[in-house]
């Protein structure tokens, strides 16, 4: 369908409609994943997409094309823009979905137009799921409110070969339950952790999303004083190791998925919190991964993240040195008493 509409657009170069925002959005993402440095062409594509979407004033329910264009815009912003601007855009997107009615399953007993009938059911669910994923995690990162759709949970996506969106969207229900405004029963945290760890995630972006959710659950554990079993801790460390490997692969592959930067930093923090010999042994690889990402994506934020990680490790070492001094003093005192 996309290529058919693209070909039709080339045949009518003077035409202008909202689907141009989709075409510009796809081209901008293609450019982002094709080269490390932003080009003038990419900036023009992004600005053209923004102009098309903003110029189509909403006088009625938003169309599927408008929502699709906004999904692409928000995906691009999640990887390139500031968190606050991405949060605002993703919140707007959820409101557009609600206004369009795409989040509702089609029903017969209505006289009102239903845009969800004009969209393939599987594509509709994917649009909604990706929009929720970006809005949810951007709001979680900032500690701000997410926009919740008043609708039943998404139906399962159709299984397709070489399609990994299903892996990502399977994480949505548990992610929703971790909303800070929810009073989640702490007894559900361990089953949720085990469920996420048992998920089959085959592609690096999906592995990073899985790891990001596990890190969120572990941080919630920290507030209730939960002690992991050795077996569960081993599974967690194995996933963290896979996530570091995935982050390095994506960074070298010019694939700036939005978790490439933040997950390695949060892994370092979690390794220090776990504070076991096995977790601390992973620190060199974790810091090297963060350093690699910072060298490839040479931004102030990445430099600050790398510096902060080094400082945290130094402070942890300093605390350990002070602990060792206490033990040494105790033994020296005991030795002096014994010789006396």
PLM feature spans:
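Short, flexible/disordered secondary-structure transition segments
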Residues: 37, 83-87, 104-108, 138, ...
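C-terminal transcriptional activation/regulatory domains of eukaryotic transcription factors
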Residues: 1-65, 72-82, 115-119, 195-231, ...
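Core helices of alpha-solenoid repeat scaffolds
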Residues: 42, 46, 67, 261, ...
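Fungal transcription factor middle regulatory core
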Residues: 4, 8, 47-52, 94-199
């Amino acid at each position: 369908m996309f290529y058919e509409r693209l070909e039709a657009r080339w045949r009518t170069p003077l035409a202008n409609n909202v689907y141009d925002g989709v075409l510009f959005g796809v081209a901008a993402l293609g450019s982002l994943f094709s080269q490390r440095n932003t080009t003038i062409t990419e900036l023009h594509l992004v600005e053209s997409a923004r102009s098309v979407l903003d110029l189509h004033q909403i006088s009625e329910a938003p169309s599927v094309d408008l929502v699709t264009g906004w999904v692409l815009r928000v995906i691009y912003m999640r990887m390139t823009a500031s968190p606050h601007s991405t949060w605002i855009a993703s919140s707007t997107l959820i409101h557009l979905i609600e206004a369009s009615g795409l989040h509702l399953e089609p029903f017969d007993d209505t006289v009102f137009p239903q845009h969800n009938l004009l969209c393939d059911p599987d594509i509709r669910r994917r649009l909604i799921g990706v929009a929720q994923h970006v809005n949810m995690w951007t709001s979680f990162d900032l500690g701000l409110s997410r926009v919740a759709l008043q609708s039943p949970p998404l139906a399962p996506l159709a299984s397709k070969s070489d399609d990994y969106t299903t892996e990502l969207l399977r994480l949505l229900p548990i992610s929703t339950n971790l909303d800070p405004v929810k009073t989640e029963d702490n007894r559900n945290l361990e089953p949720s952790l085990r469920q996420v760890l048992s998920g089959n995630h085959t592609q690096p972006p999906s592995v990073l999303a899985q790891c990001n959710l596990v890190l969120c659950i572990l941080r919630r554990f920290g507030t209730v004083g939960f002690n992991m079993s050795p077996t569960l801790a081993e599974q967690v460390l194995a996933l963290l190791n896979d996530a570091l490997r995935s982050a390095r692969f994506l960074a070298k592959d010019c694939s700036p998925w939005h978790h490439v930067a933040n997950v390695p930093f949060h892994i370092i923090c979690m390794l220090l919190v776990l504070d076991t010999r096995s977790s601390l042994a992973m620190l060199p690889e974790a810091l090297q991964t963060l350093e690699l990402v910072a060298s490839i994506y040479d931004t102030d934020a990445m430099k600050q993240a790398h510096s902060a990680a080094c400082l945290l490790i130094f402070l942890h070492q300093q605390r350990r040195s002070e602990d060792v001094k206490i033990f040494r003093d105790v033994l020296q005192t005991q030795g002096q008493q014994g010789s006396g």
